[in-house]
Amino acid sequence: MANGVIPPPGGASPLPQVRVPLEEPPLSPDVEEEDDDLGKTLAVSRFGDLISKPPAWDPEKPSRSYSERDFEFHRHTSHHTHHPLSARLPPPHKLRRLPPTSARHTRRKRKKEKTSAPPSEETPPIQEEGGAGVEEEEEEEEEEEGESEAEPVEPPPSGTPQKAKFSIGSDEDDSPGLPGRAAVTKPLPSVGPQTDKSPQHSSSSPSPRAQASRLAGEKSRPWSPSASYDLRERLCPGSALGNSGGPEQQVPTDEAEAQMLGSADLDDMKSHRLEDNPGVRRHLVKKPSRTQGGRGSPSGLAPILRRKKKKKKLDRRPHEVFVELNELMLDRSQEPHWRETARWIKFEEDVEEETERWGKPHVASLSFRSLLELRRTIAHGAALLDLEQTTLPGIAHLVVETMIVSDQIRPEDRASVLRTLLLKHSHPNDDKDSGFFPRNPSSSSMNSVLGNHHPTPSHGPDGAVPTMADDLGEPAPLWPHDPDAKEKPLHMPGGDGHRGKSLKLLEKIPEDAEATVVLVGCVPFLEQPAAAFVRLNEAVLLESVLEVPVPVCFLFVMLGPSHTSTDYHELGRSIATLMSDKLFHEAAYQADDRQDLLSAISEFLDGSIVIPPSEVEGRDLLRSVAAFQRELLRKRREREQTKVEMTTRGGYTAPGKELSLELGGSEATPEDDPLLRTGSVFGGLVRDVRRRYPHYPSDLRDALHSQCVAAVLFIYFAALSPAITFGGLLGEKTEGLMGVSELIVSTAVLGVLFSLLGAQPLLVVGFSGPLLVFEEAFFKFCRAQDLEYLTGRVWVGLWLVVFVLALVAAEGSFLVRYISPFTQEIFAFLISLIFIYETFYKLYKVFTEHPLLPFYPPEGALEGSLDAGLEPNGSALPPTEGPPSPRNQPNTALLSLILMLGTFFIAFFLRKFRNSRFLGGKARRIIGDFGIPISILVMVLVDYSITDTYTQKLTVPTGLSVTPPDKRSWFIPPLGSARPFPPWMMVAAAVPALLVLILIFMETQITALIVSQKARRLLKGSGFHLDLLLIGSLGGLCGLFGLPWLTAATVRSVTHVNALTVMRTAIAPGDKPQIQEVREQRVTGVLIASLVGLSIVMGAVLRRIPLAVLFGIFLYMGVTSLSGIQLSQRLLLILMPAKHHPEQPYVTKVKTWRMHLFICIQLGCIALLWVVKSTAASLAFPFLLLLTVPLRHCLLPRLFQDRELQALDSEDAEPNFDEDGQDEYNELHMPV
């Protein structure tokens, strides 16, 4: 190099501009003589001779003619690129002398010993890039990096040649030229003649024009080796590049190029290299040293590996997002500040201006114009990706400088824009949380802030061009009417920044979320809008900016004048909504340049809907929007799935598998299916034991939580109420042979055993309506055949055990897959109708026994009848015991009607209250879940307060005793008690055993199937074969002790699982609730069954319950179960016009008359079952119910298409865990 000038490290930055006066200073004689020699060599006449005398033409070689257009095309191609000659020099930090240390001194001494001959004093050695000197410097830098940065560089003694260095600030000392580069420059003419000449200098003399340019640059700038060079002087706005008019000319300051190139080449270079591209990352590529070893050389790889270790890997993994929109507003004292107006976790929440409270979450609706303006803003604004800043002032400083360079704002607006970005932030919750000490963070004046981030270099008296920091001066007023703008409270880090944070909001934000801050507003000092999109290199916590302490990764700034047509609020909502979109914010994390962001906006527009500007009255007009949006989302998911398939096609992952896992699906293998047949005897049972019993220790540990205690209390009342209700009704059906005490004991014993040994201990074992119907039918059959009812139940139980063992051995539980909602709806509808019918039938019997008469018998006769029909405890005796019950009692029928309807309406109202808007969600759930016990307690108190009216009470024995102690005991003899049991009935008992097995199989397996849904996230698995074996085997034992058969109660089991479900708290407002975990354990089931068993000691309290209250509970169970069946909903559509039909798949995808045909088939099956149940063959109704399964799979496919059957008979109901959602009765198709 001729001058030894070292370019700055940012090689991609624009070259600095040097104002060269037209007047050239006089040159020395030596310089003129050297320029004459070079001018003769490169004279224009010499090139003219070469052009005028072309070489001899060879006809054998192909040739073509070149025109002026070809030369012009060559100048503008990529091959016509001029690299500065000074780019071959090492970086400036490699040329700085480090302070001497003992280790470095030892290495240098060792190196001098290996050198053969020292360099000459007259000719300094040339330091070649990649040579030994550079390698030594690299090693020293790698080992003593921190030491060299911390210790100041001591200047060498005067008189020794030094390396030229660049200075970032203006406080560096002047340094002489660079040794070893022949960089001994000529001083100015006023200094004196040149005294030192080197051979290298004489061999490469510059031209007079370049020499004049160099000398002029030394006058006008601190460019000469005797002055420090400031990199900030090279930074200039793009508008200054086109300033070619005037008496001065702009040329590059690279002296090597100025000496070697002509004016035409310099003009061409300016068009390519003197322009600035804001927001584009320039990566410095260092050429490897020629003296380094090869790839296999450890010495050559060691520095590279050390360098790679020091570089921190960027985390471009997409995180959950939290977006906050802040707008520039004026407070009551007319001072500007940033005010939070909206936020996004998934949906938009706006701050209501009048009440200063948050509105309901909703889907953000954007204008199409704002999206187009946002796209144009990002295309022409500043884009700073991977910005390495950790404070808001540092970020704001770089944003403002980038805006100036990209010609968005003027340099004189720097202070105002920076002051605007650093204003304080306020949030709607600040006033609520601040209390007596409101938050008012302030900082020092603007001068100190700008002084920290804009150090002003000291310029000499040589008239150098000032840098950007010189343009700040005194801060101008931010607002024209506010003269005290310098004292505005600014945002500064530190202090109690998040004192007003909302802990409730923080719980709804995911733990790994990163925030996006959107700042928009109008300012009076700008002439055009200015915008910047910033992505930080690493998410940082900016104090007092956000409402909650969430690290910030993205910032979007948009400032502009108010007289433009830009709606800054809508533009801020647009970028905030884009950042809350899943696909766009993933693209923002992985974007490498501006074009990636624009492509993501286009992808967002492809999935958006434009609503025409027409008045919309009513929600019915917007029904098609939701369907169209679902179709667009489906296509969008298909495109994403296609991308996943393309990326995983060459790997081991199946296509679409990763997408399903991301969407929340589970990777289920065929071995995990509990209903999969193994082909071996008891193979399914063995798999259930191996799957579930290893979790037995955790089933005990997981119960150590307060939520399990609350679930025990709640499910206890939920299980006790049906036990009392069905016990009282069972005593009525069996004439007192089995009643409340037997059902309570059976529920307790079987519940404890099943909870300890079952594969799914969350199932609640209890009595159900179908079993009550079967018990009534079997009792009538035994009375008709003059058989002992309890002895017949013993043989039915023994055959039940045999059939259950055979079914489990054959792995017959897989048959539950064939029981579709078609059969479940028929089953549930039939049982609900039976409940409702039995309730009003019992009420009719009460009105028959106690009619409303105009005259009643005398009071003495009434008391005598009462004394004859009542026991000392006031309970009514069974019809078969003693004298008949009292009849013709006044007001008994009316009071029974009031008690029944009162119980029904209280329980039904509390159930509706659970899904209302009053109180909080937890309070409503507690009141709704205890609706049945509350209604029973209220009506019992009403009956207890009315002392002069007779009502029939519940029959409960004293202590642990059977209901009729004089008729039976706790053990039932299999051969008969009063008379021998006929042998033919011992064999014929297999038929009712098979029928009761159908009921137990359907209820138990369907309940287990509902509980084991993937949406409920049970992790320990289930066992259909083991559960069926336990319930069937324990049912056989119940027959020996005269206890009722039990099954898995659907509603109580689902309620038990819901009570043990833990919901995620980090759910965006308005989003669907999600399950975090379910506390799967065995202790709650054991405690619930034990408490139900201990309730037998409350005989005195239970004997106060009127039977009319139990009839009200019976009516409640029938009505609520009927309301949740889809068949009843479709049945109402027959009486409804087609225009009022709901938007359901069975309405939109099936013709109306074919839907009614499907309903008629189901109603025909229900009518047939009702007829069978009402005749002497009522015992066979489970068999007819089972026939609906082949009817669905064999006959209906001939009448309906698969598409129609999928819409009419599909199990698409998912559990609803919303506090304001539906309860268990509306989710299930099973009877109570």
From Swiss-Prot:
Domain of life per record: Eukaryota
Recorded GO MF terms: chloride:bicarbonate antiporter activity
Entry-linked SUPFAM superfamilies: Phoshotransferase/anion transport protein
Coiled coil: none
Lipid attachment residues per UniProt (S-palmitoyl cysteine): 1165
Reactions catalysed according to its record: hydrogencarbonate(in) + chloride(out) = hydrogencarbonate(out) + chloride(in)
Major localisation: membrane
Species whose genome carries this gene: Pongo abelii
Protein known as: Anion exchange protein 3
Compositionally biased intervals (Low complexity): 200-214
Family per similarity comment: Belongs to the anion exchanger (TC 2.A.31) family.
Cytoplasmic side: 1-708, 911-925
Modified residues (Omega-N-methylarginine): 295
Keyword annotations: Anion exchange, Antiport, Cell membrane, Ion transport, Lipoprotein, Membrane, Methylation, Palmitate, Phosphoprotein, Transmembrane, Transmembrane helix, Transport
